[in-house]
Structures are given as C-alpha cells and as structure tokens.
Amino acid sequence: MPASDVPPTHPRYLSLITRERIVAGVERGVTSPHGLIAHGRGEAFDYLLGEATHLFAHEAIAEAAKVLKAARHPVISVNGNACALAAGDLVALAGATGAKLEVNIFHTSAEREQAIRNMLLEAGAREVLMPGRTHAIQHIEHNRKWVHPEGILIADVVFVPLEDGDRCGALVQNGKTVITVDLNPLSRTAKTAQITIVDNLTRCLPLLVQAVQALNTGTTDNANANADNANANANVNVNVNVNANANSLPDRTHAPLYSNSRTLAEAERTLRTGTGN
Ligand code: PTJ
C-alpha cells in the first residue's frame, strides 16, 4: 500500500492515519480482515464519544494501573487489531508492569499468530509467549482457549484490549481479573470485565503506561497535584485533550472508589445524550 498522502492538516487526519495502520496490519498478515469491521465499529463509537478521553476513562486507566502494578503475574493478551494499532505501546506497558506479552487471537491462524509475535519483537519485546496447543483455559470452546502455561494459564491479571465477550467471560470464570479496552460500553466484554477502559486503544495506552510509570516512581501525587481541580467531579463529563500529558490528567484525589458499572453508565450516558462532542 502506498504511504499515506493525507496531509496532517486534514481535519480527520488522526482517524485516517489510524485506519491506515489497520489496513497495513491486514496487508502484513497481522490483522484479520474481520479486524477491519471491528475497527469500523470502534470508529463509530469513538466519533460519538467526541474522540476524546473522558473522565470515566481516566478513572479506569488509574484503576488499571494500580491493579497491574499490584499483580503477581500480569499478562498482556495481544490480538491482530491491538498489535497493528499499538505494538510499541503494548511493549512499553509490558516493560513498565513486568507483564508478559502473549499472542491470542479469535480468528484461527498459526501464520497470523507468528506475524503478531514478529511485530511485537520488532517493536522491542524481549519475549512473546505463544498459545501452543497443549494448555487451555476452561469454559470456552474456540481458538482463544489455547494459552501458554507460563502466561495466561497462571495469570492473576489479564490485560486484553478489544476482547470478545465469550473469552472475557471465560477468563473471569477462570479466576482472572480482566482489564479491557473497548469503545463500546454496551458490549458483553465491557460488561464482563472488572475494569473497562472506554476509550480508543491508541489514546489510552500511552496514558496507561504513563500512569504505571508514575506509580513506579511514586510521582502519582505530583501529577495529580498539578491537575485541574475542576475536572475532579466524577459526576461531570469532562473531555480531556487527546494528547493529555502528566500535567493535564484530572485530579482524582476526591473521586469515589472505582466502580466499573459507574464507568459504563457514564460512558453510555455520554453516548446517548450526545455530550461526547
Ligand atoms: O485478531 P483476532 O482474530 O483476535 O480478531 C480481533 C477482533 C478485534 C477482530 C476480534 O476480537 C473481534 O471480532 O472483536 P469484536 O467482537 O468485533 O470486538 C471488538 C470491540 O472493540 C468492539 O466493541 C469495538 O467497538 C471495539 N474497538 C474497535 N476498535 C477499537 C475498539 N476499542 C478501543 N479502541 C479501538 N481502536
């Protein structure tokens, strides 16, 4: 595919460039053709959410960072869409959390599993676990049941962006704490995971890495202290700049304890009332 000739000044530049990453993923054998459809669905929800990282997503990101940091054996489960969109950030998250990266795909293909592994290695991963065909989690029938014995099989926390509902439910039934990223707050995955970040993977992943790094270095309070207190009210929908950095993260000092059902309710209300834009 020719390099993009979309100028950065195009009003839909980010969206179009992201779309090209998914197309390139298909051409490279990383992403399933079905992934194009999944991406389009994500785009539609993102459009309705104003293509912004809302306060409910920031709260889920902060909770995810804490849970990943406290995990004994965290694993990042990578599929074809996540890899094409964010290989570098997934590797960075593995580095920050000490989590293992494991390939796990819905649409069965040994070649694509290998292509995903290669792309993660190119992005700097030191180790990428493959699902194999010897160990499986329970409560699921299709290809996604296969796991690595040193990865998802023994994981206590699994970060799995763009998951399908069946496997998310199976992971939970297998005793895992599941953190997902899904722009659709109505999906079965969103409702089944313990933590759902309703945001675009490309926006929230750098923020999640940053949140974990802040926990690692003990700078979380400083980041929050610099934040705009007006954003702290969890009952108000706040659009946070797409390129938010540590100094623009909202202050959650007085936010109530994390609740995934509240996150989903706020995301759904934002969608239905059109207040995302
Ligand atoms: O590589 P494979 O074979 O594992 O296939 C991966 C896909 C994503 C194709 C597969 O898991 C699938 O079909 O997923 P679903 O059931 O379509 O769910 C994808 C969910 O992710 C949908 O709810 C989309 O709204 C959401 N989504 C799509 N793109 C993004 C997203 N959420 C966050 N960020 C995105 N960029």
Language-model features, listed with the residues they occupy:
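Short gly/pro/ser/thr-enriched loop/turn and capping motifs at secondary-structure boundaries
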Residues: 107-112, 185-189, 204-205
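Active-site glycine-rich loop that binds ribose-phosphate moieties when present
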Residues: 134-153, 159-166
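A short, gly/pro- and small-residue-rich
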Residues: 165-186
